[in-house]
């Protein structure tokens, strides 16, 4: 680290942090559990707590095996690389998918894969018809890169992918010898809200990456699940990409505490708060980009003409942290902060009526301006 770099204030609470559900902090119970974690070498498959967590999550998802990764990005990239064998090939996904938009071109660099990003015709989630329209068959045409994997994200932008649509897509993938991967970073949320067990989702996919941090509240990690054969090969790519962790037992023991707790109750609490904010926005004419099925509310900044930086600064005025038009909820958000963020959004919306913001440029979730402003939470006056 640069010795001249100014350090941020110590992070103490996520109760007012709406930037992402990744900002949940480990509980005292998790930290205490880490003190009793096993200390075997997980790269050599000798750490008991790591093996227990991998087996437990795999069982929950109805899969044969699991593999601990330090992040969802790593588990996604390893999964897709494992499914792919000989280029040229392509991966089909939603145009908003994390594997396409927020994993630093990993598919192109690590898997040498072309990506076919698809805009859902219904505006919310991909249907079988959307996939068929953009699918590139392996029919001998040497000009294209045949589709080999369909990658779906559940939830995506907080939207639950309907089970009946997943069933249709799975059947078609089997007919066409295609692999089906799920970026299940927030599949816990989908399961808690829809009532669909993780095991039922697991029956529909060849692999799922399941995040342990985000709303679940563990400090880090993701479990990639699939068949024994798949995970054995995935472990090879994890090693290649520098993802082997030695004493991962501490992280896995902390994650197990989260999973064995009332995670469904935690998820549903965050969903209730998001639904309440969505109703508040509807009552005040504040447009949303998409349905608030679970723990995200996406404000439609284009329709509302809200300046995202004004929105961030209004939030700071009320002691809340926000990053652009995406409002993320997690179980550690306080009721008081919910009321404050409502007022911040309403003030930004009223401001936009007199000062409409219309910028022709890329829309970014992770805005550097917003990140800089959040750092001023203790001193900013607006």
From Swiss-Prot:
The modification N6-(pyridoxal phosphate)lysine is found at residue 214. Keywords: Lyase, Pyridoxal phosphate. GO terms for cellular component: cytosol. It is an enzyme of class 4 (lyase). Pathway: Amino-acid degradation; L-threonine degradation via aldolase pathway; acetaldehyde and glycine from L-threonine: step 1/1. Pfam families: Beta_elim_lyase. GO terms for biological process: glycine biosynthetic process; threonine catabolic process. InterPro entries: ArAA_b-elim_lyase/Thr_aldolase (IPR001597), Low_specificity_L-TA-like (IPR023603), PyrdxlP-dep_Trfase (IPR015424), PyrdxlP-dep_Trfase_major (IPR015421), PyrdxlP-dep_Trfase_small (IPR015422). It catalyses: L-threonine = acetaldehyde + glycine; L-allo-threonine = acetaldehyde + glycine. The keyword Lyase applies. One of its GO terms (molecular function) is L-allo-threonine aldolase activity. The keyword Lyase applies. Its cofactor is pyridoxal 5'-phosphate. CDD domains: TA_like (cd06502). Its EC number is 4.1.2.48. Homotetramer. Belongs to the threonine aldolase family. NCBIfam families: GntG_guanitoxin. This is Low-specificity L-threonine aldolase. It comes from Eremothecium gossypii (strain ATCC 10895 / CBS 109.51 / FGSC 9923 / NRRL Y-1056) (Yeast). The gene is GLY1.
């Amino acid at each position: 680290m640069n010795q001249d770099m100014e350090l941020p204030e110590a992070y103490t609470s996520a109760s007012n942090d709406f930037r992402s559900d990744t900002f949940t902090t480990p509980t005292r119970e998790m930290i205490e559990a880490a003190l009793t974690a096993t200390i075997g070498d997980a790269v050599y498959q000798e750490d008991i707590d790591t093996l227990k967590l991998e087996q437990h999550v795999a069982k929950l998802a109805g899969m044969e095996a699991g593999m601990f990764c330090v992040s969802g990005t790593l588990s996604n990239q390893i999964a897709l690389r494992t499914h792919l064998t000989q280029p040229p090939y392509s991966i089909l996904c939603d145009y908003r998918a994390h594997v396409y938009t927020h994993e630093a071109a990993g598919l192109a660099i690590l898997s040498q894969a072309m990506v076919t990003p698809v805009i859902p015709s219904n505006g919310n989630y991909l249907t079988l018809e959307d996939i068929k329209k953009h699918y590139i068959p392996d029919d001998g045409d040497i000009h294209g890169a045949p589709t080999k994997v369909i990658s779906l994200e559940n939830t995506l932008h907080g939207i639950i992918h309907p089970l009946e649509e997943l069933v249709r897509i799975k059947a078609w993938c089997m007919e066409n010898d295609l692999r089906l991967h799920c970026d299940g970073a927030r599949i816990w949320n989908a399961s808690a809200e829809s009532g669909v067990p993780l095991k039922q989702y697991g029956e529909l996919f060849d692999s799922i990456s399941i995040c342990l941090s985000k709303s679940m509240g563990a400090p880090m990690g993701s479990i990639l699940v699939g068949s024994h054969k798949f995970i054995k090969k995935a472990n090879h790519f994890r090693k290649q990409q520098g993802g082997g962790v030695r004493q991962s037992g501490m992280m896995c023991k902390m994650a197990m505490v989260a999973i064995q707790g009332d995670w469904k109750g935690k998820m549903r609490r965050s969903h209730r708060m998001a639904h309440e904010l969505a109703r508040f926005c509807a009552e005040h004419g504040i447009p949303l980009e998409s349905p608030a099925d679970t723990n995200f509310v996406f404000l439609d900044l284009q329709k509302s003409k809200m300046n995202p930086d004004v929105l961030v600064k209004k939030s700071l005025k009320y002691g809340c942290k926000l990053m652009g038009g995406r409002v993320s909820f997690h179980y550690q958000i306080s009721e008081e902060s919910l009321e404050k963020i409502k007022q911040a959004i309403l003030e930004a919306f009223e401001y936009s009526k007199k000062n409409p913001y219309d910028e022709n440029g890329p829309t970014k979730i992770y805005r550097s301006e917003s990140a800089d402003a959040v750092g001023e939470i203790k001193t900013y006056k607006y």
